[in-house]
Amino acid sequence: MIFDKGNVEDFDKELWDAIHAEEERQEHHIELIASENMVSKAVMAAQGSVLTNKYAEGYPGNRYYGGTECVDIVETLAIERAKKLFGAAFANVQAHSGSQANAAAYMALIEAGDTVLGMDLAAGGHLTHGSPVNFSGKTYHFVGYSVDADTEMLNYEAILEQAKAVQPKLIVAGASAYSRSIDFEKFRAIADHVGAYLMVDMAHIAGLVAAGVHPSPVPYAHIVTSTTHKTLRGPRGGLILTNDEALAKKINSAVFPGLQGGPLEHVIAAKAVAFKEALDPAFKDYAQAIIDNTAAMAAVFAQDDRFRLISGGTDNHVFLVDVTKVIANGKLAQNLLDEVNITLNKNAIPFETLSPFKTSGIRIGCAAITSRGMGVKESQTIARLIIKALVNHNQETILEEVRQEVRQLTDAFPLYKK
């Protein structure tokens, strides 16, 4: 019987080898991709539970199928914990991803072809904020706002003037590569001034918001969307919040049956675990440590005139660095750092002049190393290792030194092999 084949290593050695190799990679590489984090064993256990067997179209208490009394408890736990964590009146935990959450929010708020003002991808926005290759840009008329050319920060007066000019039905705030705190109250004032809805995509900063170390968009936005991984340190998935009952009904209808069929109740269970972890007072210490580590790492780059720190600093979990004084582009930097077991990604910088496949910058985030227990000292060391590798990118002896120093760090802060 299929139930006898419970050991992946014995049943599917080829797959197991790939999984094991990834486990070793995570254990021995320094993870600096800003959208990645390391979940607890409890989150993984919930996601790998028997809940994966259950189909449950609909919502708790109103399902299409029978036998849903147990998953109703699971999903209700996730909903109530999300509401408590973020101080929201309503929560939808069924969205499979942040992109699905954004799609549902758009469906609830606007019609195809409506004008939307969102952060330009090159300035730090996300694909789902109007990129022409994405469903958002294909379905709606997105107009992008950027950052100030001098400060590389959001200029709210300029955004207001742009909103007056284009008269959007919706304004989207939030980013995937913006290192500064966002003033959601100002964004709501801009939206109110032009009669637009305000939607905030807090995917990257959700954990910081939950911990109270970053301003919350929930009191100001008509709808807030998020992923449940990144700084929130949960499973890969989506979340939608609102304080408006009428919008909550539209959101639920947009998610199911509008965009999705059956929810992934095993993932929702993992979300519930992550929300409970984030409700623990210790999570605030973790989130503050992310900010402290990121600031410490960014400061090392700021003090080296061979690199340019975008916007001059960071207020959250991420920062961007222009690397073109020491290496041709961000792609080469990313590939080189992969070779010394430091993982990050190339990233466009504001007013980028290179191809998005090359870029002038790299993006660095500290959520994952903070989950391993690394602190300010280690963050500074990692920054120096990155600089050492990039500056000496043609010197294999020095690159090998960096590899050994990376291994010493990861051995000192084990991930799942404690």
Swiss-Prot record:
Matches recorded under InterPro entries: PyrdxlP-dep_Trfase, PyrdxlP-dep_Trfase_major, PyrdxlP-dep_Trfase_small, Ser_HO-MeTrfase, Ser_HO-MeTrfase-like, Ser_HO-MeTrfase_PLP_BS, SHMT-like_dom
Any one of the GO BP annotations: tetrahydrofolate interconversion
Known EC number: 2.1.2.1
Chief location bin: cytoplasm
Catalytic activity, as annotated: (6R)-5,10-methylene-5,6,7,8-tetrahydrofolate + glycine + H2O = (6S)-5,6,7,8-tetrahydrofolate + L-serine
Classification via CDD domains: SHMT
Major enzyme class: transferase
Record site feature (Plays an important role in substrate specificity), residues: 229
List of residues that carry N6-(pyridoxal phosphate)lysine: 230
Family under the similarity heading: Belongs to the SHMT family.
The protein's role, per its UniProt record: Catalyzes the reversible interconversion of serine and glycine with tetrahydrofolate (THF) serving as the one-carbon carrier. This reaction serves as the major source of one-carbon groups required for the biosynthesis of purines, thymidylate, methionine, and other important biomolecules. Also exhibits THF-independent aldolase activity toward beta-hydroxyamino acids, producing glycine and aldehydes, via a retro-aldol mechanism.
Name of the protein in question: Serine hydroxymethyltransferase
High-level lineage: Bacteria, Bacillati, Bacillota, Bacilli, Lactobacillales
